[in-house]
Amino acid sequence: MAPAAASGGSSLPSGFSVFTTFPDLLFIFEFIFGGLVWILIASSLVPIPLVQGWVMFVSVFCFMATTALLVLYIIGAHGGENSWVTLDAAYHCIAALFYLSASVLEALATIGMQEGYTYKQYHENISAVVFSYVATLLYVVHAVFSLIRWKSS
């Protein structure tokens, strides 16, 4: 544990070093794929409105929270406090669980699309499912490495 602490691996980056450290580099990809999920769900038709509502909530919530955390890390609002490492790990674990549930529900709703939907609408939903699973993977990887950082802090 001492080498990680000595090299700064157990603290959060600030400034533009956020874009050069792993797992914080994943913020960019979470932002991109989360935005794509948000756009695709907003423009697609889902046979079960409750599912679309949950997927929209998850994508908008995670998009906004990821953006807020990214901006706060860039401006250095954490000040090197260990509580921010805990917040980072907790947020990414919750976001990973939320996105996993949203991805599964969106996939289930897309599979259930049969009659009354065009080929284009079906493909929009398939794209939303794929990007949702990519976002889930990104959040899971970020959560795992955030938990490792939290444990070493």
Swiss-Prot record:
Cytoplasmic side: 1-24, 76-92, 148-153
Membrane topology qualifier: Multi-pass membrane protein
Extracellular side: 47-53, 115-125
Subcellular location: Membrane
Pfam families assigned: MARVEL (PF01284)
Keywords: Lipoprotein, Membrane, Transmembrane, Transmembrane helix
GO BP term, pick one: myelination
Family: Belongs to the MAL family.
The protein's role, per its UniProt record: Could be an important component in vesicular trafficking cycling between the Golgi complex and the apical plasma membrane. Could be involved in myelin biogenesis and/or myelin function.
Protein name, entry field: Myelin and lymphocyte protein
Protein source organism: Canis lupus familiaris
Lineage: Eukaryota, Metazoa, Chordata, Craniata, Vertebrata
